[in-house]
Amino acid sequence: MFCKKSLFFLLPLFFCACSSVVSVKINNVENSNLNNRHDDVPVTAIVYQLKDIKKFEEASDIDLATREEGVLGKDKLDSIKTQIAPKDNIIAVKVDEEEVPYVGILVLFANNTRKTTKIWAKTEDANGFGKNKYLKFEISKEGIKRIK
């Protein structure tokens, strides 16, 4: 009986002590990035692991793409640049929720007119539980958006 009671109290502490891994999933839908000849080409996505999002929000797309270290400074923990093919769904990065409070994504399109190119999310707002937590984003012809 004592073992059951102690297990009942210790199990939640164990789960709270374990840090959660958040997967950043990005889905690139068909015809999201048409070039001048109307070919569906891959997009380039840069996923930033951030301590704070203020500098990320204020920065221009060109500054982020060309001089991210100078623009983001110590707020940037890490970044990864990847190309995502049309109709592809990838896990761009897995981050520790306690170490990485924010994730920012910059998408570079062949034609940028009137598209949402930047987005960010708190890792604590990820869906799921434990090791199955995720932040899901979708790239379409309108730009990038978060899917809840």
Where are these regions (language model features)?
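Extracellular beta-sheet/turn segments enriched in Thr/Pro/Gly and aliphatic residues
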Residues: 31, 121-148
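Post-signal-peptide N-terminal segment of Sec-exported extracytoplasmic proteins
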Residues: 38-70
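Exposed aromatic-hydrophobic patches
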Residues: 87-96
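A short, solvent-exposed beta-strand micro-motif common in secreted/extracellular proteins
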Residues: 100-111
